[in-house]
Amino acid sequence: MLPLPSELQIQAQSIKQRFSELPVPPDLRDEDIAVLALSDFVSDMLLIHPQWLEELHQQPPQPQEWQYYSQWLSQALAGVQDEAALLTALRLFRRRVMVRIAWSQVLQTSGTAETLQQLSTLAESMIIAARDWLYQVCCRELGTPCNRQGVPQPLLILGMGKLGGGELNFSSDIDLIFAYPENGQTQGGRRELDNAQFFTRLGQRLIKALDQHTIDGFVYRVDMRLRPFGDSGPLVLSFAALEDYYQEQGRDWERYAMVKARLMGGADDPYSQELRQMLRPFVFRRYIDFSVIQSLRNMKGMIAREVRRRGLKDNIKLGAGGIREIEFITQVFQLIRGGREPRLQERALLPTLQAVAELGLLPEQQVADLSGSYLFLRRLENLLQAIADEQTQTLPNDPLNQARLAWGMGYADWAAMSTALENHMQAVRVVFDDLIGDETPDIGEDPSHGLYKSLWQDVLEESDLAPLTPHLEEAARRQLLATISGFRHDVDKRTIGPRGREVLDQLMPRLFAEVCPRPDANVALSRLILLLLSIVTRTTYLELLVEYHAALKHVIRLCSASPMVASQLARYPLLLDELLDPQSLYQPLAPSAYRDELRQYLLRVPEDDEEQQLEALRQFKQAQQLRIAAGDITEALPVMKVSDHLTYLAEAIIDAVIQQAWNQMVARYGQPSHLQQSEGRGFAVIGYGKLGGWELGYSSDLDLVFLLDCPLDVMTDGDRSIDGRQFYLRLAQRIMHLFSTRTSSGILYEVDARLRPSGEAGMLVSTIEAFADYQRNEAWTWEHQALVRARIVYGSPKLHQQFDAIRQQILCRHREDPQLQQEVREMREKMRNHLGSKQRDIFDIKADAGGITDIEFIAQYLVLRYAASEPRLTRWSDNVRIFESMAHYDIMSPEEAAALTRAYVTMRDEIHHLALQEQSSKVAADSFIAEREQVAASWHKWLAANDANVS
């Protein structure tokens, strides 16, 4: 054993002092002092439970003692009579055994592989013991879940990730998926429950038993987001539902996650065998599948962006050459060849690597390097986490913790340990780059010689610039030089360090080589400089633009085309990562893919870290909006598709925000008790306005109305029980808060809830009955106009049906035409007087006569006027399909419907493009003359015999 360095000797003296103050001071041995000096967690636990130290002396930890964990835990739970006692016993058992594992790890009486086995078996033992105890309790309270033949049904638990691979780290959360074999009902209870309800309640209680923080801490943070549909999916699924999901919707990343999936409890009963056989074809393909390399490369790129986004330096898990890259290397062979090579179907990493060597898929020396690096990194990770029982993979920067890790790893000092770490990570990176690594970046011809270099580093005259910009006027060249000079001056005032300066000197000549030949060189450069000033002290982003010449070209193209994109990139430089893959940049996601992409994006963020969750939502929105804008700029997306994509994106975010708010409220108060007997959450969100009409723009706010379905006198079922309707009010307030909180990435969306019954004077959340009553008896005509563009964007099936029925009933009312015509016209005149341009030389595309609002009012009037005789007119909430319906049902001529649609789409297109230019909707008075004349003619025909024509 190495002598303790000075930092740890000081720590040792402090520990001796603390233990000497115990009622019965223990006799501390040298190895005791070493472990206690290395781990605050161990010393804190032994000060609270000094009898555990005596146990360590009398029964020193053994490498194979994991075989007895289940037996020890059974003894610890033998006297447990209720759930509170269960929670206490589980937490104390975990702490006691974790102290033994940390002890053995520091003193190296167990090797790293044995430590990982101990940590994984401990978690598995506790999951299974808690499940079995709670299953018996639930059966007594609710009856036994059985299939249609009366056979009792078990809860099966898949351990994912490192738990599944038997490689759990010291302070890890656990990823689980719950399943049960067959549908059916409970038997022997006071009333029948279907199996889904039974297992959902059991699953909720199991998560609480493991995850809830009490005075004794917690057992494990439980993460259920890897289950089908993530947080928005059922907590527990039947085998049939699991099979349907993975066959029909399983994504590549879910396939990779399933490689390590392992049934907890090690059972070999028929149900366990059935589940394993069902999942195997999804994970391991029969054919050799090389497509996984690109998918894994994409995943690695996402992780690299995450490291940059969160500023994760010195991260031994996610950084280059870290643990994750070794896992990726191993998974490549499993996923490509695992279907044909059973030896590659191992869950644990080290045996899989050994199989890779035996099959000749990698040289033996590389496999030896990878195995050695893996064990080194995993020991370092465990020692790091054992300091304070915290889940971290970031190396410390304080001398005490650096000394702890260096000593624990067997090095005299931090410098020696860092050198060894660097060598290991470099060895991993070499293999990773060879196998999966980023495709060779296209850096183009090196333009850093000659005039482009001089243009950056020397003071040039206008005449010197002429050979590079023969297409520019003299004044434009002078402006270009002034812009460059001003940027140089600004850079000189920044602290960018020698490395930053070196990278900037590489970047600028390359950038000039792309910008100078452009006809809009001055515009492009001025916008690019805003971006460069925002990243000039962040060398990572400068390096990205140097290394990926294609990314630099995309930046120039997009910034030149749109100041909105340029200012977004300048405000949020992490969006530069989106430019690395031109295929995805100019091809936004499929409309149906936004929810799944967001779910995958949020999986990388700790579920209980609200700040990071808020940031991730905002960054996802910005990244997707950039991709939509890129498609818009390059005309890959027509105007209708731009709005469709912006609307699908908003709906995915609404879904995720509600999920977060729901989880937070349920954690605090429990669920409203009536949900145990109903489907869904008793909550719905109605999208009005541009969201309801599939017409969102880049900066649109969201018009939302919240509805609930909850009887009176319902309470929530948590420890801090509150009234059910109060729960839904707080849920809506929480949703508004999550949308509007300003983080470093701004707000998510402006949300306007004033279209709810009684507006700002009304309740934030209405019952469905109150909403219907208000619409029938109190709503003004303009509120019924708004209802034309309303649709449900989130909600339980029951509320969805109820809202649709109410909307149709209200819109199909018989209305007296002269009165309806007058009320619609008066509201339009009021809006025009309030919002119109009032300038003869200006036309406001949105608000002035002949513009978009007139078209919207015509559509709304026609629905309210004719739906009583033709209810099918209420089907759509968007203007284009409303006009199609008017033509289809012979209310409007096909020519007029097509002309109004053309006018509407043309003006909408211009508004999108003005937004990309950061300009308002006000244009020259002689714009859109033909379109305005068509709108005026239709307005005159349907609504305003005496209304002023548009000239």
Swiss-Prot record:
Broadest EC class assigned to this enzyme: transferase
**What GO MF terms are annotated?**
[glutamate-ammonia-ligase] adenylyltransferase activity; [glutamine synthetase]-adenylyl-L-tyrosine phosphorylase activity; ATP binding; magnesium ion binding
The answer to whether keyword Ion transport applies is no
State what protein this is by name.
Bifunctional glutamine synthetase adenylyltransferase/adenylyl-removing enzyme
As for what it does, the entry says:
Involved in the regulation of glutamine synthetase GlnA, a key enzyme in the process to assimilate ammonia. When cellular nitrogen levels are high, the C-terminal adenylyl transferase (AT) inactivates GlnA by covalent transfer of an adenylyl group from ATP to specific tyrosine residue of GlnA, thus reducing its activity. Conversely, when nitrogen levels are low, the N-terminal adenylyl removase (AR) activates GlnA by removing the adenylyl group by phosphorolysis, increasing its activity.
Species annotation: Yersinia pseudotuberculosis serotype O:3 (strain YPIII)
Can you state which reaction this protein catalyses?
[glutamine synthetase]-O(4)-(5'-adenylyl)-L-tyrosine + phosphate = [glutamine synthetase]-L-tyrosine + ADP; [glutamine synthetase]-L-tyrosine + ATP = [glutamine synthetase]-O(4)-(5'-adenylyl)-L-tyrosine + diphosphate
What SUPFAM superfamilies would the database entry show?
Nucleotidyltransferase (SSF81301), Nucleotidyltransferase substrate binding subunit/domain (SSF81593)
Q: Which Pfam families match?
A: GlnD_UR_UTase, GlnE
Cofactor list:
Mg(2+)
Q: Which UniProt keywords apply?
A: ATP-binding, Magnesium, Multifunctional enzyme, Nucleotide-binding, Nucleotidyltransferase, Transferase
Q: Which gene encodes it?
A: glnE
Q: Where is this region: Adenylyl removase?
A: 1-440
Q: Does the keyword Transferase apply?
A: yes
EC code(s) of this entry: 2.7.7.89, 2.7.7.42
Residue ranges of region Adenylyl transferase?
449-951
Its lineage reads: Bacteria, Pseudomonadati, Pseudomonadota, Gammaproteobacteria, Enterobacterales
